[in-house]
């Protein structure tokens, strides 16, 4: 992160020396557990967490969880040492690798959010025509393209950072001259934040406009049906995209202020940079909360991870089988004593009386 590495805390006994490790430890713990559980929920066999057959949304959420987990495990612990220790202890290679992974996962998350916003727009606006395009195979190809683009855009950060000696201390700091650093920081803001947020805003804006543009009673009913069918995944991914914009926006804004505004180094500006970095890092541990709050099907699949949830589901199925009426089988089964038609004098069967009970096909449905 830009220039935060140059400034250490004033003293080990300062408030920051205590608060920073606590905040980073919470981010690490919540992010690791939360994204690990998201992976466990999505990788278990069963229907989509969003009740969409062949859902591409699950694949995109899985990719977001992988990117967030990689960021939490590989970047947050090392970044915490930058703010709490006076020197960099891990060598030049780790210095370069950590900052490469920071921007690699940032690009992967932003590009995935842009892809899923387009996916949701196609699902709502062209539900039939987009079926051939919105397949798990194409979603996996899109995920591969996301990581390829993320690797290309983040590759310059392999040389952007390096280690320098400052007296007896080794520091992990930006190694490029100012002109090149400014050009890359502006390009990162444009490609990793501004463009994905614009795509997400346009896609969800057109989606919401289409959902609410019903004309007449028939149009209103159709729009309400579309809202019910696409609401769970759409609301969740819209919330995730909004969180990304809110959490990463201050970080990019401060970098632009550093290059194009008045941003003198002081305790106040240091606190602002630290707060912006913590907010950006916290984005990786907030997404699992959104999934859990947005979808009852996601919560149900989460409960199935635990033995008590599986036992409760098994008992419910056994109780359902015990109370199922004997006549719930298809016509002609031994439990169905009622003939399916009216006997005629010649031994044949006539049509069902109109005022009689429900047809055998309806009775066969049983409790849902």
UniProtKB/Swiss-Prot annotation:
Keyword Disulfide bond: yes
Covalent lipid adducts (S-palmitoyl cysteine), residues: 308
Glycosylation sites: 6
Segments passing through the bilayer: 21-41, 58-78, 97-118, 139-159, 185-205, 237-257, 260-280
GO molecular function, one term: galanin receptor activity
Keyword Transmembrane helix attached: yes
GO biological process, one term: adenylate cyclase-modulating G protein-coupled receptor signaling pathway
Entry membrane topology: Multi-pass membrane protein
Extracellular side: 1-20, 79-96, 160-184, 258-259
Coiled-coil ranges per UniProt: none
One GO cellular component term noted in the UniProt record for this chain: cilium
Stretches in topological domain Cytoplasmic: 42-57, 119-138, 206-236, 281-368
InterPro entries membership: Galanin_rcpt (IPR000405), Galnin_3_rcpt (IPR003908), GPCR_Rhodpsn (IPR000276), GPCR_Rhodpsn_7TM (IPR017452)
Cystine pairings recorded for this chain: 95-172
Location of region: Disordered: 317-368
UniProt keyword list: Cell membrane, Disulfide bond, G-protein coupled receptor, Glycoprotein, Lipoprotein, Membrane, Palmitate, Receptor, Transducer, Transmembrane, Transmembrane helix
Localization: Cell membrane
Entry function: Receptor for the hormone galanin. Receptor for the hormone spexin-1.
Family of this protein: Belongs to the G-protein coupled receptor 1 family.
Protein name per its UniProtKB record: Galanin receptor type 3
Organism for this UniProt entry: Homo sapiens (Human)
């Amino acid at each position: 992160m830009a220039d935060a590495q140059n400034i250490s805390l004033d003293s080990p006994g300062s408030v920051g020396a205590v608060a920073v490790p606590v905040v980073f430890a919470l981010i690490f713990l919540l992010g690791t557990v939360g994204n690990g559980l998201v992976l466990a929920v999505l990788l278990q066999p069963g229907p989509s967490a969003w009740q969409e057959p062949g859902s591409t949304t699950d694949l995109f959420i899985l990719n977001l969880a992988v990117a967030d987990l990689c960021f939490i495990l590989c970047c947050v612990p090392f970044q915490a040492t930058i703010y709490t220790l006076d020197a960099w202890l891990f060598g030049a290679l780790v210095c370069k690798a950590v900052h490469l992974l920071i921007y690699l996962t940032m690009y992967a998350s932003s590009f995935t959010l842009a892809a899923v916003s387009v996916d949701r727009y196609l699902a709502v606006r062209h539900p039939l025509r987009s079926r051939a395009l919105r397949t798990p195979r194409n979603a996996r190809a899109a995920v591969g393209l996301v990581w390829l683009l993320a690797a290309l855009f983040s590759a310059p950060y392999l040389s952007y950072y390096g280690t320098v000696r400052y007296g007896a201390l080794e520091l992990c700091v930006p190694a490029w001259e100012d002109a090149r650093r400014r050009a890359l920081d502006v390009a990162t803001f444009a490609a990793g934040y501004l463009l994905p947020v614009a795509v997400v805003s346009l896609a969800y804006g057109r989606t919401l406009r289409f959902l609410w543009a019903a004309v007449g009673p028939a149009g209103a009913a159709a729009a309400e049906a579309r809202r019910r069918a696409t609401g769970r995944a759409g609301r969740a991914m819209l919330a995730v995209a909004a969180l990304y914009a809110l959490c990463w926006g201050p970080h990019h804004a401060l970098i632009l202020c550093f290059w194009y505004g008045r941003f003198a180094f002081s305790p106040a500006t240091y606190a602002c940079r630290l707060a912006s970095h913590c907010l950006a890092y916290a984005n990786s541990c907030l997404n699992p909360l959104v999934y859990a709050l947005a979808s009852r099907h996601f919560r149900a699949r989460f409960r199935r991870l635990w033995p008590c949830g599986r036992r409760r589901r098994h008992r419910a199925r056994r109780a359902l089988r015990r109370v199922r009426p004997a006549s719930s089988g298809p016509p002609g089964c031994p439990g169905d004593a009622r003939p399916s038609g009216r006997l005629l004098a010649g031994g044949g069967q006539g049509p069902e009386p109109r005022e009689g009970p429900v047809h055998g096909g309806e009775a066969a449905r049983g409790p849902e």
